[in-house]
Amino acid sequence: MPTFAPQHCTAVLASVTVVDAVAPHQLTLPTPCAGWDLAELLTHMTAQHHGFAAAARGHGADADVWRAERFVRAVADDPAGTYAAAARDVLAAFDTEGIDEKPFAMPEFGPNVVIPGEQAIGFHFVDYAVHAWDVAVTIGAPFALPDDVIAALVPVAMAVPDGDFRDADGSPFARALPSADHDDFARVLRHLGRDPGWSQAYSTVTGA
């Protein structure tokens, strides 16, 4: 298993706790993910869990396992239950001997892209630590990850490259924002194109 496996699990479970607090009327709220309301973000998060789980089991090359449209209705009907089931699926799939060396097919990164399991789980770790924050600030809920999770997250997240490709449609992250933060999680958020000060009020004023 990757060295950060326990911290990855903690981050995913933290995202489950945050999503469990989502109320139905909040699903139309805008999020820090430009162009996505909360229902769309949760649908994406649910689909990605199942996609990574399929990749861990050797089926990642099938584009259908990543398709978010499959979960639109389920998320609308039961966001917390649908999301928790997806999180359980991916954690079970990752809890396998030798998973860090196993090849993961990742068609979202390009045709025939295959990466080692440790790298794929690293991407997943970064995604869900940040998406948990996205959901929390969207609904105005408190959010904090344990120090050991942030310490494990920082080198993985800061290794994500920046560049013109982040301007492309479908890029997982916007361009990195300038940072003078001493808070490690805030540095991660800025490196991944998030403003740590984002709020619903901010979104309304700026149109973000």
Where are these regions (language model features)?
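Glycine-rich loop at the start of a catalytic domain that most often binds anionic cofactors/ligands
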Residues: 44-45
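N-terminal cationic and glycine-rich segments that engage phosphates or anionic surfaces
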Residues: 41
